[in-house]
Amino acid sequence: MADLLLGVNIDHIATLRNARGTIYPDPVQAAFIAEQAGADGITVHLREDRRHITDRDVRILRQTIQTRMNLEMAVTDEMVDIACDIKPHFCCLVPEKRQEVTTEGGLDVAGQVDKMTLVVGRLADVGILVSLFIDADFRQIDAAVAAGAPYIEIHTGAYADASTVLERQAELMRIAKAATYAAGKGLKVNAGHGLTYHNVQPIAALPEMHELNIGHAIIGQAVMTGLATAVTDMKVLMREARR
């Protein structure tokens, strides 16, 4: 089974910084520490309201990240312009609502295939690999293929939020079937949202998974153990799940 990659989302380093309007903690320093600890990539979400990561952060990170930069962003003209200028290695297109605390669901690709095709094409034209953040739904997977995206990221929020063992098993099965279906269509399959040290291994064990993007749990654990240890511990769990 291929190695499973870990993308560390550092948005909440910026959340902590912005809570006091200071210049620390610095997302750039956090990215460096995460990479040194084994992160395979760094993910940041430049939201329309700039509530955590800022344009300046994105530009500096693009110049300093030594692995791969994954820019999460809404499907807007402004964000596409920024991405085409900065040229991160990856862009993950996500739905976005200003009032939400965090991304609440997957992107409705099936309802806007023409628009998504144009955006995917525009990003691809400048060398950016595009991922679509979608629910574990065959219809959305088919739409991602139609739009020309090489990657999808399966939204694992319902799995993470399941309140019973039976609910979690049902969500895991749904994700597993979607991952198999997507891989059969030629897509690279990533996953993320709500993954923690306690629930990551069943997702990590799915053979089709290429990369997991994890942020809040790692940054939360970093408060207790330090960022390097938090990243390393997550990598260990992911490796164990693949044995």
Swiss-Prot record:
It comes from the Bacteria. Its main location: cytoplasm. It is an enzyme of class 2 (transferase). It catalyses: 3-amino-2-oxopropyl phosphate + 1-deoxy-D-xylulose 5-phosphate = pyridoxine 5'-phosphate + phosphate + 2 H2O + H(+). PANTHER family: PYRIDOXINE 5'-PHOSPHATE SYNTHASE. Belongs to the PNP synthase family. This is Pyridoxine 5'-phosphate synthase. It comes from Yersinia pseudotuberculosis serotype I (strain IP32953).
